[in-house]
């Protein structure tokens, strides 16, 4: 029996191999092991597949690029209509482009940006504006960005697509992978399983951010997360 009755990803032979015990004995998928299995398969064949990597920001991308560029030819896709305000969006784009230009990588890395249209984000989360951070509003935002990524990966003829989002301790890696798998089936392009916070990926991203002097934002990106950050800052200030 596979994890929680779910069907295997197309890259996998035995799904149970990638499962580990979670809280209360629940089975959890180890997406890092799945990724390592895919990498090993291509290395044994002497292949360097192509990957469309959705990027949320430079700090989160730093470790992911350092890691994956050893094994893939990467096109970084910057599509984040959730980011508010526009000045913040522009700052994050510039930092990502600077990182790509400065970081040494084994295989080619290119960059493509889809224009800023905050209306796409607000339409996607309509009716869920008041849902707390980490809930359904965020899941809809995941889906919006991942769907555009899957669509473009198919158009470009890429071997795989994935996102940097799972490196964050605040992002739901299981949900990200489930959505990616579903969209991969819809658009007939392979979703690369990933949980980049594994193997101390998040810690490494902090180190690389310091090394390259990257701007590290203090909120996820959307207006709702910005308001929540400002609210918490106000509470902290009053308590001091």
Language-model segments: which ranges?
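Nucleotide-activated chemistry modules centered on ATP-dependent adenylation/adenylyltransferase
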Residues: 12-14, 22-240
């Amino acid at each position: 029996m596979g994890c929680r009755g779910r069907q295997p990803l197309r890259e996998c032979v035995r799904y149970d191999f990638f499962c580990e015990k979670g809280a209360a004995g629940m089975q959890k998928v180890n997406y890092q092991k799945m990724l390592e299995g895919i990498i090993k398969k291509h290395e044994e064949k002497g292949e360097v597949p192509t990957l469309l990597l959705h990027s949320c920001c430079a700090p989160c991308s730093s470790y992911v690029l350092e890691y994956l560029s050893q094994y893939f030819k990467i096109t970084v896709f910057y599509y984040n209509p959730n980011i508010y305000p526009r000045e913040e969006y522009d700052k994050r784009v510039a930092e990502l482009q600077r990182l790509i230009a400065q970081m040494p990588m084994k295989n080619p890395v290119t960059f493509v940006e889809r224009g800023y249209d905050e209306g796409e984000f607000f339409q996607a989360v309509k009716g869920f504006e008041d849902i707390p951070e980490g809930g359904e509003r965020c899941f809809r935002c995941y889906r919006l960005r991942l769907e555009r990524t899957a669509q473009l990966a198919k158009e470009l003829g890429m071997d795989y697509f994935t996102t940097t989002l799972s490196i964050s301790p605040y992002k739901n890696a299981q949900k990200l992978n489930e959505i990616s798998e579903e969209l991969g089936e819809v658009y007939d392009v392979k979703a690369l399983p990933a949980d980049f916070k594994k193997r101390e990926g998040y810690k490494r991203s902090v180190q690389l951010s310091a090394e390259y002097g990257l701007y590290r934002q203090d909120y996820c990106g959307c207006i709702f997360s910005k308001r929540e950050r400002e609210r918490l800052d106000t509470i902290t200030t009053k308590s001091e």
